[in-house]
Design a protein with these regions (language model features):
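Proteolytic cleavage junctions
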Residues: 1-12, 27, 43-46, 61-170
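Predominantly extracellular/luminal regions of secreted and cell-surface proteins
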Residues: 14-62
């Protein structure tokens, strides 16, 4: 947790978030109390990665739909003491540091596209980028939900039929 007016930092599970002061409630009103933070780093190399991830790894950028290759994801939620949702005020951001394991770090690009999950649309939306600094991807975000560092790739749909001795299997 941190004080809404002064900001602060929260760390855990390799994830680090530095908050500026300036938090608002769902109506856009200034919030001045203690901000509760629920945050989880979701490691794309973990066996339970898909259990925590919303939707699938399909995103949209200006050129259309893309398949996303994740280099790290974070679920972040801010609430007041009663569980009401909070967000940074307009013009305020928080710096999120996504840890990279050795296998991911070896193939990490200096800058990677940053995506957030749009719950209304049901897919990932490109919103900025993250920079590689000291073995972590760092990004400034202006709202909280699921954030994902991803390399977008084109995808194809392959249709086929499995047969045995010329007879289709069901």
């Amino acid at each position: 947790s941190f004080d809404a007016s002064t900001g602060g930092s929260v760390s855990g599970n390799g994830l680090n978030i530095v908050f500026q002061g300036g938090i608002v409630d769902a109506s856009g009103n200034e919030y001045t109390g203690t901000v509760q933070v629920a945050a989880k780093y979701i490691d794309p190399l973990s066996a339970d990665f898909f259990d925590y991830m919303p939707g699938n790894l399909i995103g949209a950028d200006a050129s259309g739909r893309k398949y996303l290759e994740s280099y790290g994801m974070a679920a972040i939620e801010l609430t007041d003491g009663s569980g009401n949702e909070l967000q940074p005020a307009d013009g305020k951001t928080a710096e999120v540091s996504f840890p990279l394991s050795g296998a991911l770090l070896a193939g990490a690009q200096a800058t990677i596209p940053l995506w957030h999950f749009n719950e209304a649309k049901g897919y990932w939306v490109l919103e900025g980028s993250a920079s590689l600094e000291g073995g972590v991807y760092k990004a400034n975000v202006s709202h909280f939900s699921f954030w994902n560092c991803d390399i977008p790739t084109d995808y194809v749909i392959i249709n086929g039929q499995i047969t045995e001795g010329g007879t289709p299997l069901s």
